[in-house]
Amino acid sequence: MQVYELPPSLFSRAAPLFAEAWMDRAFIQGVFEDKTPGRIFVDDPERPTAALLCRTFEYYVAGSPDAAALRRFMRDAPAEVYGDFYGYVATNVPLARAIVADYGERLRVIARRGYAWAGDVAALDRWRGPSEDGVTVRRLDRALAERMDRELGQLAGVFWGGYDRFLANGFGFCTMVGEEITGVAYAAAVAGTRRNGCGEANIDVMTAEPFRRRGHAARACTAFIDHCRAHGLVATWDTDSDNQRSALLARALGFREDHPFAQLSTPGYRPLDLAEGRWQVAAPDGAGVVVWRSVEGD
């Protein structure tokens, strides 16, 4: 029993399997466009019928639920691959059900909502321009992005595989009072043409505790939306279905709910039990494909 890890030069072989995804397209396509790092495992290196796309935060799974070797690989969760695992998102319902069946109580289903901005530009005017309480909006540079991650517990450097990639392919804005960062809205992922002729940029939002409910997030988000509109991008927003505060802010800013989806994560987001020594890795072949073989056989 074996699975195949594709080199980036062959990622395109797995791309058609993810075309059915209606969620997190910026996260998925960003890997195929080499904007963010990722790894792709398939059941067949020439004509894959199922694929696992691993990137920081979510692991995306597409294709047929009948790919037994890939399902075994996922169930075992080799430590060499699953260090960044946060949760699975499957691109079709039969595959999601298969993953739940394989993992049993090790995973729980988390309902998620996806939004896309489709609001009135003029309705955001109140969040543009000078602020009476001295709040300024600045675009994130490297120093501010590093401070944002460090001081507000954000993950731009993690999502993008480093700040160089974030600055080259992503963007974001922060609100400040003096030199203190009070709120942020930044791209967790960006991808090219995918929705109605536009690209997508998925927003991550945070306000420092002492400054919440004072419009700081709305100002940073407005700058983010304006940047998206100027660069042919649709701003998208994801949140857990029970996060009412996030949903209320999204709707207030003009985001409209898209199709819901599900994330499969461990209870309490505790670390996944990882396998050691169950899969052997062969040297890459001439095309750069790496074969992973189960030591337990078929």
Question: What do the PLM-derived regions correspond to, one by one?
Answer:
Residues 161-178, 182-208:
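A conserved beta-strand-loop-helix scaffold within acyl/acetyltransferase catalytic domains
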Residues 68-75, 203, 207, 213-228, ...:
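Conserved acetyl-CoA-binding loop-helix of GNAT-fold acetyltransferases
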Residues 47-48, 180-183, 245:
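Glycine-rich acetyl-CoA-binding "A-motif" of GNAT/NAT acetyltransferases
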